[in-house]
């Protein structure tokens, strides 16, 4: 399928175009092809929802398309509006099947598209639900600094770590030693009552299993509390 054919088909079916930009030497690209793209659930969702193209960024018209859409790392997943031929959602990196399907779902929700999220963040949008979407997106593309900065802003804006949606975002996206981990440890009984001992212990155990020795020793009391 050529680019022109994909655009025409996407317009006719009123679908976005999905492009998997890869290279022959890209290890994560091969891993995604073998372990994620080949799964029936993933294939069914993407085939039903998008016009799909797998494009070698270093061969043929892939060179032009990669340059046009600013592809600098591999794999890059680009979702294109066929009417304008502009990219509306971008993702990347190795993802689990669940993450990859969610990436596709987000592409079809205008308020969860990467370009919308970045535009709104730049304009100063710091609404709670928006920040959580922003955090989840940047976690999915391994932009850890953006995740941490946005989570800090979420808390500074009045959200509490004990709020269910904030706790979920913390568990899923914030890693390593930080003040939030200490807050969980210092208020262990309260967090266990709210979210269950198993979930709290799992988070503490995960985050204290690596890091600088001095940091781990500083949080030694956590280990006394955890029994999993």
Describe the function of each predicted region.
Residues 1, 21-23, 32-62, 71, ...:
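Thiol-based oxidoreductase modules, predominantly thioredoxin-like and allied folds used
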Residues 71-115:
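Non-catalytic, surface beta->alpha helical segment in thiol-disulfide oxidoreductase systems
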Residues 13-17, 48-51, 74, 82-86:
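Loop/turn elements at helix/coil->beta-strand transitions in domains of secreted/extracellular proteins
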Residues 121-228:
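Oxidative protein folding and maturation machinery
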Residues 99-103, 113-132:
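CheY-like receiver
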Residues 29-33, 65-66, 89-92:
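Short, solvent-exposed loop/turn and secondary-structure capping segments
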Residues 12-26:
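Short active-site neighborhood of thiol/selenol oxidoreductases, capturing the structured segment around
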Residues 1-16, 46:
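A short beta-strand-turn-helix
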